[in-house]
Amino acid sequence: MDGKTDVKSLMAKFNTGSNPTEEVSTSSRPFKVAGQNSPSGIQSKKNLFDNQGNASPPAGPSNMSKFGTTKPPLAAKPTYEEKSEKEPKPPFLKPTGVSPRFGTQPNSVSRDPEVKVGFLKPVSPKPTSLTKEDSKPVILRPPGNKLHNLNQESDLKTLGPKPGSTPPVPENDLKPGFSKIAGAKSKFMPAPQDADSKPRFPRHTYGQKPSLSTEDAQEEESIPKNTPVQKGSPVQLGAKSRGSPFKPAKEDPEDKDHGTPSSPFAGVVLKPAASRGSPGLSKNSEEKKEERKTDIPKNIFLNKLNQEEPARFPKAPSKLTAGTPWGQSQEKEGDKDSATPKQKPLPPLSVLGPPPSKPSRPPNVDLTRFRKADSANSSNKSQTPYSTTSLPPPPPTQPASQPPLPASHPAHLPAPSLPPRNIKPPLDLKHPINEENQDGVMHSDGTGNLEEEQESDGEMYEDIESSKERDKKREKEEKKRLELERKEQKEREKKEQELRKKFKLTGPIQVIHHAKACCDVKGGKNELSFKQGEDIEIIRITDNPEGKWLGRTARGSYGYIKTTAVKIDYDSLKRKKNTINAVPPRPVEEDQDVYDDVAEQDAPNSHSQSGSGGMFPPPPADDDIYDGIEEEDADDGSVPQVDEKTNAWSWGILKMLKGKDERKKSIREKPKVSESDSNEGSSFPSPHKQLDVGEEVYDDVDASDFPPPPAEMSQGMSVGKTKAEEKDPKKLKKQEKEEKDLRKKFKYDGEIRVLYSTKVASSLTSKKWGTRDLQIKPGESLEVIQSTDDTKVLCRNEEGKYGYVLRSYLVDNDGEIYDDIADGCIYDND
């Protein structure tokens, strides 16, 4: 009953306003004690408080679960405010045994109740240091010490809104001061009565401020910052000072929720008016309630924490009181916290238990019903099959707390949970494949599982997509490869063009002979470099610098090689040339016999040809130049082949007529060339010359890619001389020098071609020659290289010198030449 009377006196004094400064100066000064006191200590404090009489001061200490004693005497110790006014330095900068945390001095005197508190900025304990106090059980202390420390701590909370930098002092350091304070126990009793002579609750409006600063206090985890604001009653200060050091910073909400229900008086919960007048706090509690309703997992987690924490902190309720607005709001929030899971639609996982296991897929599904339904009712096929086929999937989609629906339930649904699937198209798609492989197995075994079919369809589509990606990759790779090949081809063509231009190559490049290097040669600008024993392909043996051939190595590099630097088997080369030119030499002989014997020579090879072959024999085939031996068999063809050859022959006639007229002028000189070739029969170029002469009549018709006949004729003319002169390297060097002079002096570009041969008139008399004129003798034979104009031509004499010769100095055989060409035209036209 004493507790109830104290509550009534508290409520009465709480409703009466008073001076705020007096309240601040006279309010009890609780201190923060980290740790937990045993229930026996609490009972002893209650008994001690009851022995003091019916004094009213216990508003502050009586509602606190641990402070059952009164304030120390007024003249015992100086207050912290008085010391701060006297001393420029705060006493907390240098910690001593007891004073740094609780502010107790051995020679302190209790402050004057009438003195107004000046809100200085002393260094007070850090919030972090307060929250870091461990929760070890504290040794029971004398009641006087607790009240003395309570007054000092309340003073600290009044003066110290800003945290200082002084570290806390361990609890063990407080023991030396217990004996001193216990001696003054008898003097403490009247102090609360003097303090209560003044109004306890000066500002009623201060009670509303904790609602505004509660969130800040929870965010900053700093309890001392809220203490100057929460001064609605000493009960508030008691709750604040006793509750804050016990709770760690991160466990404030949970600890407060459990600390609020307990009070020093059983079954009594104080609800001061300040809590009713704080709309901000109620709004915050409502907002938190809404958050807890929406955030289900968080509430479950908090519920588990609430169940676990009483075991960890069994005596926490004794540290807090429920008299303050802050404590009351936390009590309400704690009640709501414990009650909210009941209002949730989904109970916690501990109540629900493990979720039901997912039903396994049926191994076999009979689809005969669906076929009958499709054949009977096409309109109902989207209802019954889907309702039955969707039986296995629905249980996972339903809430776990609900029992599984009966089998007939899906038929009543307006639409299936899955999108409608047409059964017939998969059957139609699968049917032709199974017809090919198993001849209608689907009809016999009921088409198998529809789910498996659809899964296989999905796999098939995935394979198609992957195959498309592969095809795209292949296409890209092929494009890259084609581009690389094109680039390489272009590079090869470019190199080939450069080589053709550099070495004046015409027509396809053919390998005439293979030779082996007999020594190491370090090539020059146009010369080929090779090592001893390396295989060299001879590309051209004519129209080269004297004593050199055009060769190619296995690496693909071109250049001139000296004939003395390679070993050549002339016998094999001659046999090869003869086999290559086996067919063309026949028309050459006919050409020298003025075309009349062509049919006679060609007759043995064309026994099956028609009678028209006597007039014009079929020309060699297109491949005659390359495959001479095989062409003999090709000539023994039937009449259609003869027709094709005659057509090609007529085309060749037009091409011959279109060529230069000077081609035929060299025919008269052919006998000389043939004689020289017969003399040099051991040398291999003679068959090549005969091939070139034969091209005049036949080969030039079909071999459009081969070098023009005039060039080859000139090569044939010069080959006999060069090969005869190969034994004399001096003449070869001289010839090369003359060719260089020709190109330099006469600015002659291109290959040196002999248009025709002629003779100097015998009536020529010696005269002076110019720098570019060729010194000639009467009756000397000349080779015409270029027809410069109507008065002079560029000629070459037997010595290999070049120069201009007047046409008047030459034998006038133009008429004969042109008549011969005309005759050739007549023969061609026939």
Curated annotation (Swiss-Prot):
Residues 465-502 form a coiled coil. Residues 1-501, 601-646, 660-739 are annotated as: Disordered. Residues 450-464, 621-636, 693-703 have a biased composition (Acidic residues). The modification Phosphotyrosine is found at Y570, Y698. It comes from the Eukaryota. Residues 510-571, 747-815 form the SH3 domain. The modification N6-acetyllysine is found at K13. Keywords: Acetylation, Cell junction, Coiled coil, Cytoplasm, Nucleus, Phosphoprotein, Repeat, SH3 domain. The keyword Ligase does not apply. T-cell receptor ligation leads to increased tyrosine phosphorylation. GO terms for molecular function: lipid binding; protein-containing complex binding. A motif (SH2-binding) lies at residues 461-464, 595-598, 626-629. One of its GO terms (cellular component) is protein-containing complex. This is FYN-binding protein 1.
